[in-house]
Amino acid sequence: MAFQTQGSNLRALLVEDIKVNRMILSQMLRKFQVETTVVQNGKEAVELFLGGETFDIVLTDNLMPIMTGPEAISKIRAMGATDVMIVGVSVDANSMEEFKDAGADLCVPKLKLEILEHILQETRSKKNKSSA
């Protein structure tokens, strides 16, 4: 089940199965006024892209029920979604490699406000250049 928060000109998709992590990451994105859609597994993320939804950035966990983050990334990239910044979030070193192999742009072990701010600035800059 997806839900959204509204704000800036950036659209984010948060893919996370653990409720407390969803809440924390959603609050972080809200702090930067990012319009955020939240889903609980990779399958739900893929279904949004199949339905024509577009996002500027995707933040995804690795291990989730139904479909993992790397599986979702591979499917999203295979659909031609190459402009979206995809960030894998996991403390597991093996996950980092899985994310990169699947097509993630970036992998972070823990998302801190400073790191998220930098990623969002980079994403905004990329979006502004492509729409200019």
UniProtKB/Swiss-Prot annotation:
Pfam name, any one: Response_reg
GO biological process entries: cytokinin-activated signaling pathway; phosphorelay signal transduction system
Residues annotated as domain Response regulatory: 11-125
UniProt-listed CDD domains: REC_hyHK_CKI1_RcsC-like
Post-translational modifications: Two-component system major event consists of a His-to-Asp phosphorelay between a sensor histidine kinase (HK) and a response regulator (RR). In plants, the His-to-Asp phosphorelay involves an additional intermediate named Histidine-containing phosphotransfer protein (HPt). This multistep phosphorelay consists of a His-Asp-His-Asp sequential transfer of a phosphate group between first a His and an Asp of the HK protein, followed by the transfer to a conserved His of the HPt protein and finally the transfer to an Asp in the receiver domain of the RR protein.
4-aspartylphosphate PTM positions: D61
Keyword entries, A-Z: Activator, Cytokinin signaling pathway, Phosphoprotein, Two-component regulatory system
Record's function text: Functions as a response regulator involved in His-to-Asp phosphorelay signal transduction system. Phosphorylation of the Asp residue in the receiver domain activates the ability of the protein to promote the transcription of target genes. May directly activate some type-A response regulators in response to cytokinins.
Family the entry assigns: Belongs to the ARR family. Type-C subfamily.
Protein's name according to its UniProt entry: Two-component response regulator ORR42
The species this protein was found in: Oryza sativa subsp. japonica
Name of the gene: RR42
